[in-house]
């Protein structure tokens, strides 16, 4: 196998227009009146990126502080998008306990790709959160 083949494959995948999937761009988290949403959580993800960020949606305004997520959202989020100049801090247990992770501005279509400790990941593992924008 040519050493050039993996490089060409990586370049081809990077140039695919839908590589980020059906998730909105982080810059698109704005309201018509000029205010912005800090982050959006989605309860559906998929091995195919174009099918991510589907299902139910939870929008968070800047300053959202939820040590206890609503019962239908606890351990449910599997995709998320964070607006520019915003940061979403999540915890694995209610009351802001357990493992923690900070997501900066960007699109995260598959939370399975983000490690939570040695054996876990962040898909269906968010029990508390805090979202802030500067």
Swiss-Prot record:
Cell location: Zymogen granule membrane; Zymogen granule lumen
Keywords tagged on the record: Cytoplasmic vesicle, Disulfide bond, Exocytosis, Membrane, Signal
Subunit structure, interactors included: Monomer and homooligomer; most probably hexameric. Interacts with GP2.
Modification after translation: Contains intrachain disulfide bonds.
Function text: Functions in exocytosis in pancreatic acinar cells regulating the fusion of zymogen granules with each other. May have a pore-forming activity on membranes and regulate exocytosis in other exocrine tissues.
InterPro entries noted in UniProt: Syncollin
Annotated membrane topology: Peripheral membrane protein
Organism: Homo sapiens
Signal peptide start and end residues: 1-21
Gene, per the UniProt record: SYCN
Record GO cellular component, one term: zymogen granule membrane
GO biological process: exocytosis
Superkingdom to which the source organism belongs: Eukaryota
UniProt cross-references to Gene3D superfamilies, sorted A to Z: Crystallins
Pfam families, A to Z: Syncollin
Residue ranges crossing the lipid bilayer per the database entry: none
Record protein name field: Syncollin
